[in-house]
Amino acid sequence: MNERAIRQAWERFVDGGDEPLSVRSAVAGSWQRSKNFKISVESQAAPVLSEAELYRCRADSALLSATARPAMQRAAEILDDASSMLILTDGAGHIIETLGDRRTIEDGREVHLQDGGCWREDKIGTNAIGTALAAGKPVQIHASEHFCERVQKWTCAAAPIFHPIDHELLGVIDISGPPTTFSSQSLALAVSIAGNMEVLISQTIKNQHDRLMNFFREKQRRWASHDLLAIDRRGGIVHASPDALRKFSKHLSQSDTDLSYLRNLPFDHWPDDLSKRMVNMRTVLVTEGEDELGAIIVFPSGQKAPEPTAQKRRRHLPEASSIEHTNIR
């Protein structure tokens, strides 16, 4: 990589808008996007979330963080002596975890390469995190390939992490350090970690679906006269009794049968939201410990069944030791 030629191409681009023919197409495209976003090359640091905002981001990315932590900790042991840091972001480019060499982590604070920093291209220009998010594929950005001059003191390699079922871009795993740490192996390591995380996420989802199905089967035995539909925390249909899908489609227009919007809705808001869309139904929220597993939508079979008394409702609930929170409406 000819750092001097890249620096000269960057200077010509930011000074006169000359097409950067001597740089990689991924970098040239990102520079142009950064210019379109009106990013100043003199920007000193990325914006940073407040503590409350960072808390919400971490809560929203709980599945990602939980599955990432073991893989990140193993990789961080390697990077601890390599003057590099390992970074996890959410799907919006907010840094939610940092591990690795302590000095490198401390140096990262100068440009807000830290927990809460936002590294999308529209916030801080070309960088491995933001460009991987924009392109949806792994990318390595070295030194003068960064759009903002102060960030050119870094070399970074990032790989996106996708949800194994609906392929939503969940976040990015990034390896960053000073330019002297540049290695093509950094990108390979980032890709490997991202792949391992996707496997772990898939296993976690299967486990959650299994626990949701255990609850579904219990309700199916107790409410034999009702039709039941099980949906996971992202609004995906996991299982349904024979007539439940027909009733579900009858209640909703074709466009409304996509419940994926629920993934971004606070869990305790689900019953109210779903009751407005589907009359004469109830929603049972299913949690186990701190895991929000999903919900069971209960459709009456034939005439509407009478609302159970408080005593009967308690009998219908699972034991607190197995399901710590349910909400029947």
List PLM regions with ranges.
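A charged amphipathic helix-loop-strand protein-protein interaction module that recurs
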Residues: 66-72, 112-141, 194, 245-285
